A protein has these predicted regions:
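N-terminal subdomain of nucleotide-sugar transferases
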Residues: 1-44, 81
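Active-site proximal beta-strand in glycosyltransferases
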Residues: 4, 101-120
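Conserved catalytic-core segment of nucleotide-activated headgroup transferases in glycan assembly
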Residues: 22-25, 175-181, 185-252, 263, ...
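Membrane-proximal helix-turn-helix segments that form the acceptor-binding/catalytic region
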Residues: 126-145
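Acidic donor-binding loop of glycosyltransferase active sites
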Residues: 143, 275-289, 302
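Carbohydrate-associated surface elements
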Residues: 151, 173
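Short hydrophobic beta-strand element within catalytic cores of glycosyltransferases
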Residues: 293-296, 303-307
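A charged, aromatic-enriched C-terminal amphipathic alpha-helix characteristic of glycosyltransferases
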Residues: 342-368
Length: 368
């Protein structure tokens, strides 16, 4: 069994965002197939870990990102542990990763969740050109890079001339391996909890709401999509909004309670809501947005209506009729797609072959 060290630069347990959930589930399933040790921050609840060893070495404060004392500490851990490879989540610690490799010779992988500079450029950060240079340098030096999306991988290969032999797919995974049989039961449970009529369509939006791309998507629902839906006099529906971090200025969406909007806040079991939903709404127009939630929604049987930006990164060929895409800002077309969703269409089996965690880890092990 391979001995693998992984470094997560921020707290991910318990998880609240899609990125945190990705790391948590990736490590959980990787730990089942390798001898895994994870170094992360003191702010994690490692009592939730069951398949790997954890070391809370990184500081809680932002100074952890430039803590030069980590060079000696992680070098010692690598040498004493006899690890075969190290996986660094995100490129932020590239300066540290290659100093550790120089001292130990360990095979070094970067796990990138986005082309980071593009994400920060899209949200207006002035320093994106600096990050672009740093990120490109990081990719050039890595022994291997794991990409969430085929688009990101092709960008690195075509634009930054990264050797394709060093580029590997690592999509966001789902724990289920088949279309759920309990969707009706889950719908009834959610409907009872939120006083939803049996005749109502259930539309769902889920995401960390203090993340600007998600907040902008929520505003698109409130200001554009919902008003268009409400014009259809024969449509009975409710839109459930899930997620923590809603700004106080929106007052828990109380002003929209009489407009078919239900604010559920953070929910412990989001899979219940995915199974209950007829349609998941993904009107994201910048940044990373809700891509991870989109994969989960389709896995649990909901149909997703997404903008082009929102749908970027998902393997559309395996989604069948469970993914409908419109252009960004095309709210009339977006609304028409919602209205034209065919109820009851199953998720294709090919979707689970690609996105089930056990299948993902099986392929990933070959590259370590």
């Amino acid at each position: 069994m391979k001995k693998v060290l992984a470094i997560a630069p921020y707290p991910y347990l318990p998880y609240f965002s899609g990125g945190q959930k990705f790391i948590a589930q990736f490590f959980h399933y990787l730990g089942k197939e390798t001898d895994l040790t994870v170094i992360s921050t003191e702010g994690n609840d490692f009592s939730l870990v069951s398949s790997y060893k954890a070391i809370p070495l990184l500081k809680k404060s932002f100074s952890r990102y430039y803590d030069r004392g980590l060079i000696k500490k992680i070098t010692a851990i690598v040498k004493e542990g006899g690890f075969d490879a190290v996986i660094w989540e995100h490129p932020y610690y590239a300066w540290l990763a290659y100093r550790v490799r120089k001292r130990t010779g360990i095979k070094t992988f970067m796990h990138t969740h986005n082309i980071e500079y593009q994400r920060f450029k899209s949200t207006g950060r002035w320093w994106w050109p600096i990050l672009k240079w740093y990120e490109k340098s990081c990719f050039n030096k890595a022994d291997g890079i794991f990409f969430i999306t085929p688009e990101d991988k092709l960008f690195a290969i075509n634009n930054w001339k990264i050797d394709p032999a060093r580029c590997f797919d690592l999509p966001f995974g789902v724990e289920t391996d088949k279309f759920p049989a309990d969707r009706l039961q889950c719908r009834n449970e959610v409907a009872l909890k939120h006083s939803i009529s049996s005749n109502d369509k259930i539309y769902l939006f889920n995401g960390l709401l203090n993340y600007k791309p998600n907040l902008d998507a929520l505003k698109a629902i409130l200001e554009h999509i919902n008003p268009l839906l409400s014009k259809n006099e024969t449509l009975a529906y409710k839109i459930i909004i899930c997620g923590k971090g809603l700004p106080d200025s929106l007052n828990n969406l109380k002003d929209y309670a009489d407009k078919n909007i239900i604010y559920a806040g953070f929910v412990d079991d989001i899979s219940l809501y995915f199974k209950a939903a007829d349609v998941m709404l993904n009107p994201v127009q910048s940044g990373g947005g809700v891509k991870t939630k989109m994969v989960e929604a389709i896995a649990y049987g909901a149909t997703v209506v997404a903008t082009e930006t929102g749908a970027a990164g998902i393997e559309k060929a395996v989604c069948g009729s469970k993914l409908l895409i419109t252009g960004d800002n095309e709210w009339a077309r977006f609304t028409n797609c919602i209205l034209n969703v065919e109820p009851g269409n199953p998720t294709p089996a090919e979707f689970y072959t690609l996105y089930n965690w056990e299948q993902i880890i099986k392929k990933l092990k070959l590259s370590l």
